Amino acid sequence: MDDYAVLSDTELAAVLRQYNIPHGPIVGSTRKLYEKKIFEYETQRRRLLPPNSSSSSFSYQFSDLDSAAVDSDMYDLPKKEDALLYQSKDYNDDYYEESYLTTKTYGEPESVGMSKSFRQPGTSLVDADTFHHQVRDDIFSSLEEEGKDRERLIYGQDSAYQSIAHYRPISNVSRSSLGLSYYPTSSTSSVSSSSSSPSSWLTRRAIRPEKQAPAAALGQDRQVPLWGQLLLFLVFAAFLLFVYYSIQAEEGNPFWMDP
């Protein structure tokens, strides 16, 4: 692995792309991991290739960072050998799918062949998950549409139900005089008569009269009116005052003496 330590970050990224190894930005903490992956890849490659292969040894020469002359024939492997290599390594397909889709190669564009080769292992799983999510979304959307249709049947007959005035019952005379045709009556259409919600609105009592109802009931329960109670209180007070003055007159002044 010492041979990879002399490579720069750009050169190491080129080797990773050449071997179709997914990678992210090369920093100090991830460089050792990528060097280890390249070393394992080279080891497996030597086992799969014939002994007399000229590409068994690792030789990577760069003349300049801007103009990198890489022998492509040395690192190009057939697709069959690549498949055998990854199967022998027992890599996790989910890891390759996630790492390739979430990471981005910095510095150089990605090749189309790499994206196809790494997306193939998880294509069936992604398609299955997408299908299940689509079916679930369709079910939820159908349920929402059914709920909206029910609301339209109940509340869609007129837009005046949102007002607080529908809680106040109005007689037929006042309704006809005011010209309020949106209150359901006994001669409504078949749609309004079939629904029980509009008829239940009229049976509700008014909000404000309910708050005033206890006071009205208290006034009806009184046997003596309020003015009568005040009159009795004044008479009783006058009687007590008369008794007090009469007692004071009988006792008289204790310092007063008869001549």
Swiss-Prot record:
Highest rank taxon of the organism: Eukaryota
Keywords assigned by UniProt, alphabetized: Acetylation, Actin-binding, Membrane, Microtubule, Nucleus, Phosphoprotein, Transmembrane, Transmembrane helix
Residues annotated with Phosphotyrosine modification: Y161
Major place of residence: nucleus
GO cellular component entries: cortical endoplasmic reticulum; microtubule; nuclear envelope; nuclear inner membrane; nuclear lamina; nuclear membrane; nuclear outer membrane; nucleoplasm
Domain LEM: 1-45
Subcellular location: Nucleus inner membrane; Nucleus outer membrane
GO molecular function terms listed in the Swiss-Prot or TrEMBL record: actin binding; beta-tubulin binding
Topology within the bilayer: Single-pass membrane protein
GO biological process, one term: cellular response to growth factor stimulus
Tissue: In the ovary, highest expression is seen in primordial follicle oocytes (at protein level). Detected in embryonic fibroblasts, skeletal muscle, heart muscle and tongue epithelium (at protein level). Widely expressed.
UniProt cross-references to Gene3D superfamilies, sorted A to Z: 1.10.720.40
Residues covered by region (Interaction with F-actin): 46-223
Parts of the chain that traverse the membrane: 224-244
Modified residues (N-acetylmethionine): M1
Residues covered by region (Interaction with CTNNB1): 168-187
Phosphoserine modifications at: S8, S29, S54, S72, S88, S99, S141, S142, S171, S174, S176
Disruption phenotype: Early and highly significant depletion of primordial follicles.
Pfam families, per the entry: LEM
Role according to the record: Stabilizes and promotes the formation of a nuclear actin cortical network. Stimulates actin polymerization in vitro by binding and stabilizing the pointed end of growing filaments. Inhibits beta-catenin activity by preventing its accumulation in the nucleus. Acts by influencing the nuclear accumulation of beta-catenin through a CRM1-dependent export pathway. Links centrosomes to the nuclear envelope via a microtubule association. Required for proper localization of non-farnesylated prelamin-A/C. Together with NEMP1, contributes to nuclear envelope stiffness in germ cells.
Subunit text: Interacts with lamins A and C, BANF1, GMCL, BCLAF1 and YTHDC1/YT521. Interacts with TMEM43; the interaction retains emerin in the inner nuclear membrane. Interacts with ACTB, SPTAN1, F-actin, CTNNB1 and beta-tubulin. Interacts with SUN1 and SUN2. Interacts with TMEM201. Interacts with NEMP1.
PANTHER family: EMERIN
Protein name per Swiss-Prot or TrEMBL: Emerin
Organism expressing this protein natively: Mus musculus (Mouse)
Designated gene of the protein: Emd
